[in-house]
Amino acid sequence: MELYIEKKFLNNFSKDNSGAAIYKIVRKMFIEYGEKRVFIDFNEDEFKGLNSENEVFNLLYNISPPIPVNSIKEHLFSKSNFSQTIVFTNSKEDWFEAAENKGGLCFCFDNYQEKIKEIVDKLHFEIDLSERFKGWEFLNNYSNLKYNQITIIDKYILSGDDLKKVEDNIIPILKKMKQNNNKLNVSFLTGKLVARNLEHLPEKIKEKAKKRCKFISSETKLPLTDIKIILLDNELNFDFHDRIIQTNFSMLECGKGFILKGVNPSNSVIRSETIFRKFTYNRLKNIRKRVNICIEKQYKKQENYELLKKNGTSPNPEFYMFPFSTK
């Protein structure tokens, strides 16, 4: 995670003794969250004063020493990849919209409590599936969150020849979660695309993946190049068992999976949370690492596949990703 914190915001934040719930959440994020990079607009001359006078800066420094930058805005737009980026400034800036369109979250001192409370209120929820599923309208709540990545982890969500379950579930999910004001990459981590008797035929897998991607692209208006299907394998030493839809800042889980329209009630639950709960931040961080390992491995195997194919050697179909080339 990247935190961009303006010095003026930090000074005002450190003086706040209200003990409000959202204040406590943000303070915990600054001080207790691990594996983050923190950028603050300060220089060496200001360091001693901040370290001695600002309690939050002092505590933050002991966990994740901040990186000094000359300008929050300039560093953000020139260096950040907006993978998981949150900005805190003292006043609302005219460049917030541009940063949010890239997938960042932007707050100022006057609105951070209100905006984060709205995110927590809208996106921390549970849905009981012992009652008949009522549809995907609850995903409208995601309009309160900015993100540029959706990863759907479900071994069976794209399996079978019938497109109806994709049309009734995946398409409305993506339509609800799609945000028109920023680029969105969608990845499916799945286990089965073709029947068992075709699993040894890479071209059949590729053909099926293309059909799925093209259908999803045509129905959601997402560019074909922004949709990826990644086949899971058994060599990762990690079991992607539970079904999850994750963004840069949130996790939506359902043990039963996300093929829900028209199916019988069950003992499953849909749970949604964001990184404004530390437990969920840690879970999302760990799973994102595993997803990235999986994707990197698939790219390497993909290169092997092309090389093996040119040499006339039968490739291993367990490792496969579409689009077939990122160049």
Task: Explain the meaning of each model-derived region.
Residues 1-128, 140, 167-327:
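PLD/PLD-like phosphodiesterase catalytic module centered on the HKD motif
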Residues 159-162, 197-199:
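A generic structural signal for short coil/turn motifs at secondary-structure boundaries
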Residues 1-8, 145-156:
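Short hydrophobic beta-strand segments
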Residues 131-138:
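A short, well-structured juxtamembrane/interface segment
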